[in-house]
Amino acid sequence: MIKGENNIKLIIKKKIINLEYMFYECKSLKNIKELKYLDTKDITNFSDMFYGCSSLSDIKGVENWNVSNVNNFSFMFNGCSSLSNIKGLENWNVSNGNNFKYMFSYCSSLSDIKGLENWNVSNGNDFSDMFNGCPSLSDIKGLGNWNVSNGNNFSYMFNGCSSLSDIKGLENWNVSNGNNFSYMFNGCSSLSNIKGLEKWNVSNGNNFGNMFNGCPSLLDLRGLENWNVSNGKDFSFFYNGCLSLLDIKGLGNWNVSNGNNFSYMFNGCLSLSDIKGLENWNVSNGNNFSYMFNGCSSLSDIKGLENWNVSNGNNFSYMFNGCSSLSDIKGLENWNVSNGNDFSYMFKGCLSLLDLRGLEKWNLSNGNDFGDILNGCSSLSNIKGLERRNVSNGNDFSDIIYRGLSLLDLKGLQKWNLSEQQ
């Protein structure tokens, strides 16, 4: 390994089979022209080779490298923040490569991936973080011919690609072996539609957490209607921060019966006015519903949740926090929340909520945190619906009705069972 050197003169006296970390963090290295004479035919590992070479702007010199025996390309150009194009790689035979994770991650100037069009990545199984942190990348059409059928990990692949406005090039990808799609398009703030994903077979996927988190330009979910997510367990943060998302009808056919984590799923979806499409969801295995609709300030109607089986849910904190347009919650009347222990902030900031009809039958006996549950519900005039409750396990009742400015009638609270409170 040559670490942090400014001027490099490479003299090779014997056969090399491993170039791992060779120029690790050589931050002043600007070009690698002299490497054109390097005999790479026996090399098997290129991982971290140019890791952190932040001044490297030109990769001329590697065009004719024989990389046919290399299996590990992970982190190879990670952190090469001055690298704007990779045209010199078009003739590389990467057919033996199985590990491509972080290969071009944090190449913040990379705007063009011409050179990768004809790569044979058919043996690749790990593509995680491959283009993570490439905010200048606006076009991935060059990946259209990639055979990723052996890939199992696609997590963070395009994470932070904030200039990516469409996903043309991925339409025909065979991702049927993929199990991890978490954070795949996280932070793609210019992405406005995902229609090209309708053919994806994600039936083996179990982790979808944060997949489209932080995609504020995404308008609808057309393209996902027929996704088979039946093996999915983690749906947390899936559409978190999708500020422009108007419609989630495309999720109506999703089988989420194995899902256990739905936290933050639609958190911060400011434009979402209804949740039609979720009415047939089987969430019976879900245990975490915290922040699910937090900050959905346009949500005025929760029709679609009436028949949800939330009997395994233990965390409902912040679930509807900040839903300032929500005026009634009648649709929750049949919810079995008997396993719930955290109800804190659940309806905080629901400024338009007029009454609590829908909560009359709720069994809160296992709840221990009720802090701020109705804080800021300034249109609430009474708390009918919460009478005669056994909340003896509760340890936090702080600010339950703080800033409930219109709350005139507190009758019912005197019938709460607080017998174990000190």
PLM region spans:
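Negatively charged
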Residues: M1-Q422
